[in-house]
Amino acid sequence: MISYYFQGFALGAAMILPLGPQNAFVMNQGIRRQYHLMIALLCALSDLVLISAGIFGGSALLMQSPWLLALVTWGGVAFLLWYGLGALKTAMSSNLELASAEVMKQGRWKIIATMLAVTWLNPHVYLDTFVVLGSLGGQLAMEPKRWFALGTISASFLWFFGLALLAAWLAPRLRTAKAQRIINILVGVVMWLIAFQLAREGVAHMHALFN
């Protein structure tokens, strides 16, 4: 059964490594050393719920509900455009230190709300956990399925805590004005690219619904 664990771990790691909204947010909180371990835990717990739902049967709901998929997609597009705009505005600020200080004033609950939006309004999360993991893990018998899910969840916990701790450790180098400008530009551009990609997928979904 251990082979199913490592299969799940490898697949989970492959899906979570690319830079996306979750990773960017965890990295930024680590650099600020602002509730970064709490955010890593909440991201990992969110993945636990989504992965479990996808592997143990939730994928059927998304696949059979094209309107739900469209709603999630366009909600994600709107959020990613807003999130990317915020990062680019911070990067282009004439007083980056003041802009960063304003971000640091955010309270715990606002940070948690942003994390939940970054996670649950990202359609790629549902495609990864419900469609990809659901189609692969859902075909297994119950015992291998549990090991497969455990491996995938382990990859998520290891990655988010590792990213948060590494970003906090590198904070003295990454918290400079130049580094912050580069990071925010990178995050903003990536968020907009993902948003435009999702918008194209959303248009295709809407076209399929009305034809």
From Swiss-Prot:
Disulfide cysteine pairs (residue numbers): none
Transmembrane segment boundaries: 1-21, 37-57, 68-88, 111-131, 147-167, 179-199
Listed Pfam families: LysE
Superkingdom field: Bacteria
Catalytic activity from the UniProt record: L-arginine(in) = L-arginine(out)
An example Gene Ontology molecular-function term: L-arginine transmembrane transporter activity
Keywords for this protein: Amino-acid transport, Cell inner membrane, Cell membrane, Membrane, Transmembrane, Transmembrane helix, Transport
CC annotations in GO: plasma membrane
Subcellular location: Cell inner membrane
Topology of this chain in the membrane: Multi-pass membrane protein
Family: Belongs to the LysE/ArgO transporter (TC 2.A.75) family.
Function according to Swiss-Prot or TrEMBL: Involved in the export of arginine. Important to control the intracellular level of arginine and the correct balance between arginine and lysine.
NCBIfam families recorded: 2a75 (TIGR00948), PRK09304.1 (NF006801)
Protein name in the entry: Arginine exporter protein ArgO
Organism: Salmonella enteritidis PT4 (strain P125109)
Gene: argO
